[in-house]
């Protein structure tokens, strides 16, 4: 038996074929474009996602018996606004998670409606990437399009709709819309009223592992699959990645070094960050989690290496950063290339190198980029620690986690052991696991994780190096407050 996992990312979809033992039989990826129609805007055509899935799944199954595929589960980029009309046609391009156009709407929600009310309604405050501010923006700036909305969806839910014909979402992904009462797992009437939408315009809610339907005849024919393949609700990318790393059940932590970076802390019970810096979301295992999200993580290293240094050989750039250089770098980097969410909630914040001298070598800047991302992740960890959340160790995933140097830097910046899973496929693997649960192969997500997820070698922190990084983090931590006003002034000049 096989299960297909779909990782609907920002730049590509990654498709994964998993057998009943948890082994990955095949992986295929298909890229699609991102449009930046105005500074700070970020959009995609949902048709490109579906075309990539339709092209990729037959390639994924090449050489395999498609009749043995039993289920499909998707993990997808969160927060994106997909709107359909009465004919289920896409009304406008999807406004993505990293789109920054909604600051005025965020200010209205947090300032006029008020953070206390938002937290009471949804367990969260407004952030520029969330879905509700995008609905307000659309109502104000595209009223004709807004009036045509029949269904509001998230990116991976659009794929599930194309697979099954069912308008659905799951609790983990819906948590990031600012429309869900996270504690009670239902749509918030207050938030729907604020945004001017009806509950009938929203998809049906499911737990991540629950089946939402089987393939339509059209989808089955296009993909070369049996029509009785079960499709589960799936999860937001971070929740799916946590499942794929084994971070299920209470008291676990998973850190992701993907395009964005996350600190994902699981809990069996509902809880809210009193500082409103961490998100309080539902988890794909039926529980809850606190999550800090930095908008630029591995993407910072990609930008630095490819756009500035004009190289894709990341390992070669990191080779000069020897052990004696760790904890001794006098160059600091703020990784706010797309603004920042946790903990600053500041779309105007920007990237910066601080501490350059005439004798600063190229490798010191590369090291500063890796350390700056690690320090930003520590910002999120420190907020959790301030609320007596004990983080003694963490699993680790994402493209950046493949770098031994970055793992070592992060382990020492955080002062905790970091362990990537043997299968480093994040949301796609988690999606396939959820599909296996939906098909009855395992009684629960936790049972599936215990059976399939196995640890790789652990990167341990070094006490002396932890002390050095503590001192440098204290310096780095003061840089954003010192530059905040300047960032706002730069934004005003645009």
List PLM regions with ranges.
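Active-site core segments that coordinate phosphate-bearing ligands/cofactors
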Residues: 4-5, 103, 110-127, 133-168, ...
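N-terminal glycine/serine-rich phosphate-binding loop of ATP-dependent small-molecule kinases
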Residues: 1-92, 120, 148, 220-221, ...
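Structural signal for short hydrophobic segments within the conserved structured cores
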Residues: 26-30, 203, 457
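Short glycine-/acidic-enriched loop or helix-start segments at secondary-structure transitions
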Residues: 15, 81-84, 93, 265-266, ...
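Short, acidic/small-residue loops that bind anionic groups at enzyme active sites
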Residues: 92-106, 421-422
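Residue-level signal for inorganic ion chemistry
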Residues: 22, 45, 72, 99, ...
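Short beta-strand-loop/turn "lid" adjacent to the catalytic site in phosphate-handling enzymes
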Residues: 58-97, 125-131, 160-181, 204-207, ...
